[in-house]
Curated annotation (Swiss-Prot):
Protein name: Thymidine kinase
Keywords, comma-separated and alphabetical: ATP-binding, Cytoplasm, DNA synthesis, Kinase, Metal-binding, Nucleotide-binding, Transferase, Zinc
Recorded superkingdom: Bacteria
Originating organism: Halalkalibacterium halodurans (strain ATCC BAA-125 / DSM 18197 / FERM 7344 / JCM 9153 / C-125)
Entry binding sites for Zn(2+): 145, 148, 183, 186
Length: 204
C-alpha cells in the first residue's frame, strides 16, 4: 500500500480468529525496528493466553508488549519520541481506545491496531468497527474454514464442541479449544434472532 507522506495515521488489521492478524502486526513491528524506528506495543491485560508480556501469534512468533487494563493507560505509558504504537486484540479494550488512537495519530504517531472485526455472533465488533472507519489503511485477512475449505471471515465459538448461543457473553478469551474460523455458510449460532423486519420474515 502507498503510505501518506505526513506523519501520523491509523492502520487496522482485522479478520476472524486464526487469520494471521497478530502475525501481521508482529511483521510490521519487526520491519519498523529493523528501520531503527521506536515502537511501543500494547496488549489488553485480559489476553494472557500465551504470554502476559508478549504478543504471540498462533504459530509462535512473538514480540514484547506492555499489558494494560484500560485504554487510557496506553497514553500514560506512551513516550512522545515513539514513532509507532501497535495495539493487539484491540476489540478487548474499552471504547476510550478510539479517542486514544485518534489522539496518537493526530500527534504524529503511526498507530497499528489488530483485532476481530466480528464477534462470535457474526456481528460488528466494537471498537474495531469504528477504528476501521477512522483508519487510513485497513487490511482484512481471512482464514480457511475447516468444515468446507472456503475462505473464512467469521469466528465460530464452541462450547463442549457445540455452537454457542447468541445470548452468551460477547467476550470469552480462548484459542483453539473454544474457537475456530468458519465461512458464512458453516458459521452457526444457536438462538440467533432474525434481522429482517417481521413482515419480511413472515413472508407477507
Amino acid at each position: 500500500m502507498q503510505m501518506i507522506h505526513k506523519e501520523g495515521w491509523i492502520e487496522v488489521i482485522c479478520g476472524s480468529m486464526f487469520s494471521g492478524k497478530s502475525e501481521e502486526l508482529i511483521r510490521r513491528v519487526r520491519r519498523a525496528t529493523y528501520g531503527r524506528l521506536k515502537v511501543q506495543v500494547f496488549k489488553p491485560a485480559i489476553d494472557n493466553r500465551y504470554s502476559e508480556q508478549e504478543v504471540v501469534s498462533h504459530n509462535g512468533n512473538k514480540v514484547c508488549a506492555i499489558p494494560v487494563e484500560r485504554a487510557m493507560s496506553i497514553l500514560e505509558q506512551w513516550s512522545e519520541d515513539t514513532d509507532i504504537v501497535a495495539i493487539d486484540e484491540v476489540q478487548f479494550f474499552d471504547e476510550d481506545v478510539i479517542g486514544v488512537v485518534d489522539y496518537l495519530a493526530d500527534h504524529g504517531v503511526r498507530v497499528i491496531c489488530a483485532g476481530l472485526d466480528q464477534d462470535f455472533r457474526g456481528e460488528p465488533f466494537e471498537p474495531t468497527r469504528t477504528l476501521m472507519a477512522m483508519a487510513e489503511y485497513v487490511t482484512k485477512l481471512q482464514a480457511i474454514c475447516p468444515v468446507c475449505g472456503s475462505p473464512a471471515s467469521r469466528t465460530q465459538r464452541l462450547i463442549d464442541g457445540k455452537p454457542a448461543s447468541y445470548h452468551d457473553p460477547i467476550i470469552l478469551v480462548g484459542a483453539a479449544e473454544a474457537y475456530e474460523p468458519r465461512c458464512r455458510h458453516c458459521h452457526q449460532v444457536t438462538n440467533k434472532p432474525s434481522k429482517l423486519p417481521e413482515t419480511a420474515s413472515s413472508g407477507e
